[in-house]
Amino acid sequence: AIEIVDDEFNLSRREIINVPLLGQVAAGEPIFAEQNIEGYFPLLSEDMPSGEAFMLKVRGESMINIGIYDGDQIIVQKQNTASNGDLVVALVEDSATVKTFYKENGHYRLQPENDSMDPIIVDQVDILGKVTGLFRRYH
């Protein structure tokens, strides 16, 4: 038989937060618009970043070198600033993208973590948040 010997593992006493899972974002629409929310994902509050958060489903293979794969769901702390080397969700030409952020010589480089892909170089970028976690289903 299994016996719980520590109250720390008692899930009934832990706070659950429902994090919005955002779907595809249409051009020109605010990413956080109600129609972009596909559902909610329950996470323990202690596993959450501080502040507001959301989740996005990853599409594509631009981040495979750091273990983020097509179909993964990333947990994102909502913020509009980033430091060099941060893994961010950025809005570029009305599309959300996950890349490593760098500010260089008056422009921004959004670096894919896939050796076969080129960076995105832009003069202006909107940071939606910093990636703080990942959820993956094994099929």
Annotate each language-model stretch with its function:
Residues 1-65, 103, 107, 136-139:
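Short, positionally conserved secondary-structure boundary motifs
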Residues 66-139:
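C-terminal regulatory/effector modules of DNA-binding transcriptional regulators
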